[in-house]
Amino acid sequence: MSSTTIALLSGGLDSATAAALAREAGHRVIGLSFDYGQRHQRELRAAAEVAQALGLAEHHTINVNLAAWGGSSLTDLDQPVPDQGVQDGVIPSTYVPGRNTVFIALGLSLAEAKGAERLVLGVNAIDYSGYPDCRPDYLDAYQHLADLASRSGREGHGTQLWAPLVEWSKTKIVEEALRLNVPIASTWSCYAGGDHPCGVCDSCRIRDAALREAGRPDLASR
C-alpha cells in the first residue's frame, strides 16, 4: 500500500512541483487548496487544473476568509500590489498575516484524518519574497509543535512536514518542473487580480526570470 501525502496546492509553480515530487516518490497525493479572499482568485482554477493534470487522488478546496481582517495587499483591494523588487530585510505588503501558519494547521488536520505520513509544501526561502513563514527555522519549529499537538505525533507516528524546494533557486524549481512534466502553463503565480499575468509584480518577475534562465522564455508572462 502506497504512502499518502497531503499537498498544499496554491495553483502556483512551486506547490505544483512539490506535489509532482510526492507523486514521483510513489505516494498517493491529496491536494488541499484555500480560498482565503485573495485578489488573485485565478490561482484556484489553476490549482484544480494542476490537480487533474497530475492525477491527484483527491483535491479539496476550503474557505478561510483571511480577507475579513485584511493586512495584506493580496487581500485588500484598496492596497496596491507592489511592482518593485523586494528590498533586503523588508517584508513586503504581499505577506498575508498568519497565512502559512493557518494553512499548515489545516493541512495537518487533514493529514491526521487521512492517515497521511507527509504534508508537502512548496515554500521557498531563496529566490522568493522574504516571507518569515517560508524559512527552514519556521518549519522546524512547526514540526515540533505538530509533534506535540497531535495524537499521531504523541503516538510517535505524526505527519512530517516536507519542504523539498525550501533551499532551491527558482531556476532549479523550473528545471525540476520541466523534468516532472508539471503543466507549467496551467500554473498561476501573479499577485494581481486580472485574467492575465501582469508581468511586473515580484512573483511574475521571479518566475519569468527563472523560465528564461531555464531556456523556456515561451512560458514567461511577457
From Swiss-Prot:
Cofactors that this protein relies on: Zn(2+)
UniProtKB keywords: ATP-binding, Ligase, Metal-binding, Nucleotide-binding, Queuosine biosynthesis, Zinc
Keyword Iron: no
Positions of Zn(2+) binding: C190, C198, C201, C204
MF annotations from Gene Ontology: ATP binding; ligase activity, forming carbon-nitrogen bonds; zinc ion binding
One BP term from GO: queuosine biosynthetic process
InterPro entries: QueC, Rossmann-like_a/b/a_fold
Top-level taxon of origin: Bacteria
Annotated pathway: Purine metabolism; 7-cyano-7-deazaguanine biosynthesis
Job description of the protein: Catalyzes the ATP-dependent conversion of 7-carboxy-7-deazaguanine (CDG) to 7-cyano-7-deazaguanine (preQ(0)).
Family recorded in the similarity comment: Belongs to the QueC family.
Protein name: 7-cyano-7-deazaguanine synthase
Native source organism of the sequence: Synechococcus sp. (strain RCC307)
Gene: queC
